[in-house]
Amino acid sequence: LPRLCYNVRVSGTKDTGSHHISPGLPAMPEEEKPMKHFRFRTSCISLLLALAMLAASLCACAVPGEPTASQTDPSNTAVTSADASENNAETTPSCSLPELDYGGDEIVILSRYREGWTAGEIAVESILHEPVNDAVYERNKIVEDRLNIKIRSVEINCEGAVEIVEKMMTSVGGGSHEYDLVAAACYTVVDNSLTGNLRDLRKSAYLDFDKPWWSQGFNESIEYKGMQFAVTGAAVLSMYRFAFATLFNKRLFTEAKVDYLYDNVRNGTWTLDYQNSIVETFYRDNGNGLQDETGDIYGFVSNDYIGVDPYWSACNVRILERDENGDYTFDNFDAQKLQNVAEKVLQLFYGHGNASYDYKHYGNDAEQDDIRNMFAAGNAAMATLRIMALESAVMRDMKDEYGVVPMPKYDEAQKDYGTLLHDQFTVLSIPKTALDDRRDRISAVMEALCYTSYNIVRPAYYDVALRSKLVSDPDSAEMLDLLFSKVYIDAGVIYTGPLSGFHDQFRQLMGQKSNRVMSTYQKKARSTRSALQKNIVQKLQKLYDSGNA
């Protein structure tokens, strides 16, 4: 299985080949019981059988050991769910949690419920004989039994991203400890972490940050001088579902005599220039000379709001990196490179007459549904969408077959493809009202949840739902492996608020059809450096100096 964001280059690291960082965890107290390692051993042929066996194996001791997790070869696409379960059991490192018994204590998790986005990510009510739902249900039961706790999920039904953090802040401001764990949109939590409302997870006893069920990319992007206030990984499926990709309609490609995009990806020629070169090939007007949502066939459909975000990662444009001392730096930002990217994107969106269709942003990213619906209706040859669009009823009912590939590269000279996660992917944090012993208890729950998700929920979603049901061919399954192995997390994107919406400005310029990108960003450079120091570095340093996070 690909390890999403686990062994990829990320903003804030040097390209030295290995990008793991030390977990910096304190040694276990001597009075703790000896560690027992838990490994999954299953050769199931159905997910429900796997869940039953995994539930039993998690509660039993295995021989201590730390086998090295290996990356599945993306070219090996003929993988059944049974093969995946067996392979996962053989390669997953064991969990190093000691025996812990919390006497039936209740752990309260505050999270966001948005249907089609994050619903059911933290908890579900019952078994529905649906793989992902049932895997989440079984995961929570396993963790409850393993630690002798009760998980109480408090889900707030909201479309916006900020309500969860606001509710947590109200609780913290009142000095009450209502919530043990908060699961909320990344950029809102990262912004709030600078206020001192969250506990330093690196000081907790049981989080093993180096394990593959935690996102190493996120860790390396957000860690500061041994402090870290949020974490993400296999416990939350938005780490998969919010990744951007290019979808293409196989029927329209066949009719236009254009080869499917898979070989272009493999040989490195899937670039913005190539995408631009084929857009007009697919366009067919219904006869009225106008751009109609139905009736016309378009070469490309997207939008100039979050639809332009993925080009930061896809074209290897970095905002924040780290200097030789490990501090954030803006000095490597390349405004000329972004200008060049903008010219290619403007050409793709607006330079082909009526051949591209641009949905304008409205609501809480509601235009993404319009893009998906146009593509599913067979009215667009290519579309930029998040992976979660594949789960919708209209995509499942789509008459035409479709393929999935990564976002196009900047040019053929660029070595790797790059994948961006929509900045609302879920991260986990602990409110500062949790005292030290409580924080350690919550950290044990977090470690158990993420480890169990890695072995149960992730295969249910990735292998059973996504690779086996939602994509129709082994080529797309191979592309998904590649796509997820190239996720890049830039601190300049997830710190968007403190940086005064630096990456958001690109959306505005593309929406205005403006090619003044270089001059605009050169003017912003001074204020961005100031914002970096004042709004991020100085606040992090203050938290570090206080030593009481």
Predicted regions and their residues:
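Gram-positive cell-envelope targeting signals
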Residues: 1-87, 92, 143, 178-180, ...
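Short, well-ordered beta-strand elements
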Residues: 103-130, 149-154, 180-181
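Extracytoplasmic/periplasmic solute-binding protein
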Residues: 110, 115, 176-182, 186, ...
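Short, polar/charged alpha-helical segment
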Residues: 118-148, 246, 251
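Extracytoplasmic "Venus flytrap"/periplasmic binding protein-like
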Residues: 146-223
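Glycine-centered hinge/linker elements that transmit conformational signals in sensory
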Residues: 276-279, 311-364
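Extracytoplasmic/periplasmic substrate-recognition and gating elements
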Residues: 395-466
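Conserved C-terminal helix/tail region of periplasmic/extracytoplasmic solute-binding proteins
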Residues: 431-443, 451-549
